[in-house]
Amino acid sequence: IFNKAYRKVLGQLSARKYLHSLMHSDGIFTDSYSRYRKQMAVKKYLAAVLGKRYKQ
């Protein structure tokens, strides 16, 4: 009985660790993607501002 309960707990813990690792890798991708989008927005803004200055 103890061994069966112990295996069940270990199985739950390993499943949680697996899900946590999936969420972690997804978080890293999302963080990198949002950082990339912010950089693109800044570049676009600077191009618009500097482009207007050069045209004047």
Curated annotation (Swiss-Prot):
Any one of the GO BP annotations: insulin secretion
Primary role: PACAP is a neuropeptide involved in diverse array of physiological processes through activating the PACAP subfamily of class B1 G protein-coupled receptors: VIP receptor 1 (VIPR1), VIP receptor 2 (VIPR2), and PACAP type I receptor (ADCYAP1R1). Exerts neuroprotective and general cytoprotective effects due to anti-apoptotic, anti-inflammatory, and antioxidant actions.
Keywords (A to Z) from UniProt: Amidation, Hormone, Secreted
UniProt-recorded Gene Ontology molecular function terms: neuropeptide hormone activity; peptide hormone receptor binding; pituitary adenylate cyclase activating polypeptide activity; type 1 vasoactive intestinal polypeptide receptor binding; type 2 vasoactive intestinal polypeptide receptor binding
Modified residues (Leucine amide): 50
Family (UniProt): Belongs to the glucagon family.
SMART domains: GLUCA
A Pfam family reported for this protein in Swiss-Prot or TrEMBL: Hormone_2
Alphabetical list of InterPro entries matching this protein: Glucagon_GIP_secretin_VIP (IPR000532), VIP/GHRH-like (IPR046963)
Region named Important for receptor binding: 42-50
Subunit and partners: Interacts with ADCYAP1R1 (via N-terminal extracellular domain).
Gene Ontology CC: one annotated term: extracellular region
Subcellular location per the Swiss-Prot or TrEMBL entry: Secreted
Protein name: Pituitary adenylate cyclase-activating polypeptide
